[in-house]
Regions:
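ATP-dependent carboxylate-amine ligase
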Residues: 1-197
Length: 197
């Protein structure tokens, strides 16, 4: 996996907006870690569009959208009772959590729920960074379920649970007005929880 740094993300967004690729202009800034081949495809398609003004924009959008469908990266799943589930369990770090929160804040749902797993490889500041993310989450979510995380942050919105308790606690929220974001580092295997729903 490769991280697209800010310089290239800005370049891609600028070119996308300039070419009215709304898919890129509005959404790519919220995707922080992209598969390198997908990043390459986006740049290649934009350059092709610049060289050939007769390019079919809808076909380019479709190719990019198809390649952006990476399991575990803001993958939309239809849950029980038409609940919207976003599986962002492929990887996690503080920046990607905050970007996901910003993205979620723009969506219109009656209930927004975060199921948060541990962020790996944060070193000595791990507890502090988890606390920071949890604190920020309280501003964007109605309920937060922290899976196997120890934190000092207290709030009526926050529940600290084990994996085995999550599904039972989530089931009362299943309806079409609810969005549930699952996000954690890959090592947490959050997709195993999603599979139980």
């Amino acid at each position: 996996m490769a991280r697209i740094d800010n310089k290239y993300r800005k370049l891609i967004s600028k070119k996308a907006i300039g070419k009215e690729l709304k898919l890129l202009g509005n959404e790519t800034k919220d995707i922080f870690d992209l598969n390198f081949e997908v990043a390459y495809l986006i740049v290649k398609e934009i350059l092709n569009l610049e060289r050939n003004s007769n390019s079919d924009l809808s076909e380019i959008k479709k190719r990019i959208q198809d390649n952006l469908k990476i399991p575990g990266r803001m993958e939309k799943i239809n849950g029980p009772n038409k609940t919207t589930i976003l599986n962002d369990s492929y990887n996690a770090n503080p920046d990607s959590f905050l970007a996901a929160f910003e993205f979620i804040s723009k969506l219109k749902y009656k209930h927004k729920i975060l199921v948060m797993g541990e962020m790996g490889e944060l070193g000595e500041k791990s507890d502090q960074l988890h606390d920071l993310v949890i604190q920020k989450a309280t501003k964007h979510f109605d309920f937060i379920f922290c899976v196997d995380i120890n934190s000092k942050i207290k709030s009526e919105k926050i529940n600290y649970l084990s994996k085995s308790d999550i599904v039972i606690n989530l089931s009362r929220f299943f309806d079409k007005q609810t969005l549930i974001l699952f996000k954690a580092s890959r090592s947490v295997k959050m997709e195993t929880l999603i599979d139980l729903i």
